[in-house]
């Protein structure tokens, strides 16, 4: 039995901190022989910026917004896979989700049976953390596997 995880899940949002997490996850994956999976969680805006006054309940508008969010997720994931490839690593799977990042990251980790989640931390201030919470804090609290939070 190995002490190393067989699957590592990298959670990314394309930020500078996520790039640091990507480097750590790719390095760990390569050195331990673990599969590397990447997840990006897009969000669905509650209002439309293209049609002021339109609500998210409009099925056509909701579909277009969802397609836009899914395209954003695919673009982000493609860029992350290329970054891992440039560092000599390989991505075993990509996962695009829409929703709350913390819940979706933990959900994907559970689906995969990931042995480690790697993500960056933005170091939000105490007021923002109190009002909105921190994705990394929430993932650490709710994940069913170890979590590596990479800071600058």
Model segments located where?
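Structural beta-alpha unit
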Residues: 1-4, 17, 31, 78-117
């Amino acid at each position: 039995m190995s002490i190393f995880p067989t699957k590592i899940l990298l959670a990314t949002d394309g930020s500078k901190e996520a790039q640091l997490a990507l480097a750590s996850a790719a390095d760990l994956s390569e050195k331990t022989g673990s599969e590397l999976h990447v997840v990006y969680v897009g969000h669905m805006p509650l209002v439309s910026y293209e049609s002021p006054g339109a609500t998210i309940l409009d099925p056509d508008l909701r579909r277009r917004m969802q397609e836009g969010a899914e395209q954003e997720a695919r673009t982000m994931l493609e860029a992350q896979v290329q970054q891992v490839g440039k560092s000599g690593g390989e991505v075993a799977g990509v996962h695009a989700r829409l929703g709350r990042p913390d819940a979706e990251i933990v959900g994907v980790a559970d689906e995969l049976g990931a042995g480690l989640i790697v993500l960056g931390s933005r170091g939000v201030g105490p007021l923002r953390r109190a009002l909105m919470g921190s994705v990394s804090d929430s993932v650490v609290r709710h994940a069913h596997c170890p979590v590596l939070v990479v800071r600058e």
